[in-house]
UniProtKB/Swiss-Prot annotation:
Any Pfam family hit: YgbB
Pathway assigned in UniProt: Isoprenoid biosynthesis; isopentenyl diphosphate biosynthesis via DXP pathway; isopentenyl diphosphate from 1-deoxy-D-xylulose 5-phosphate: step 4/6
UniProt similarity note: Belongs to the IspF family.
Cofactor entry: a divalent metal cation
A GO MF term: 2-C-methyl-D-erythritol 2,4-cyclodiphosphate synthase activity
Keyword Lyase appears in the UniProt entry: yes
UniProt KW keywords: Isoprene biosynthesis, Lyase, Metal-binding
Reactions mediated catalytically: 4-CDP-2-C-methyl-D-erythritol 2-phosphate = 2-C-methyl-D-erythritol 2,4-cyclic diphosphate + CMP
Cofactor remark from the record: Binds 1 divalent metal cation per subunit.
Top-rank lineage group of the source organism: Bacteria
Coiled-coil region: none
Descriptive protein name: 2-C-methyl-D-erythritol 2,4-cyclodiphosphate synthase
Lyase listed as a keyword: yes
Amino acid sequence: MTEIPSSFVLPDPEWIYRVGIGQDSHRFLPDEDPKPCILGGIIFENTPGFEANSDGDVVFHAICNAFSSVTHKGILGGLADELLKTKGITDSVVYLQEAIASLKPTQRVSHLAITIEGKRPKLLPQLPSMRKRIAEVLHIPLDSINITATSGEGLTAMGQGYGVQCFCVLTIMEYCRY
């Protein structure tokens, strides 16, 4: 049996990484509905809002779900519903702030990868504004966030223009001593 040289022995880890995945989707309201379309905290003009109890921001909702997959604390369908019921809060920024607050003091957001599928609205011109808004809410550097967008070539209901879907992968660094 080959002996492992001491130079290959790893030190006790001080940082571990946890990865969360989140998803959300909503159907558009009729075109004449006045509810605004909000994605990543940005209002998209000339596009109807989403069928949702909240503002329907599928980007912030997917991020909330990614936090929940790391922290095991239900934000959407749990805390967000309670905030809506007791205080009338529909702003997804508030839900995302609650998700951030669910982190342990030893945990930090390292990176966020987001992909959005939908035929409308046209996302490309607003991606920089969306990244900036997400960075502000999460209190992380802009270069820790990336967003891609696709129409899905019309293969799904989202790509056919019925709604928008978002997937998110969240990387959390956690300081721990074993």
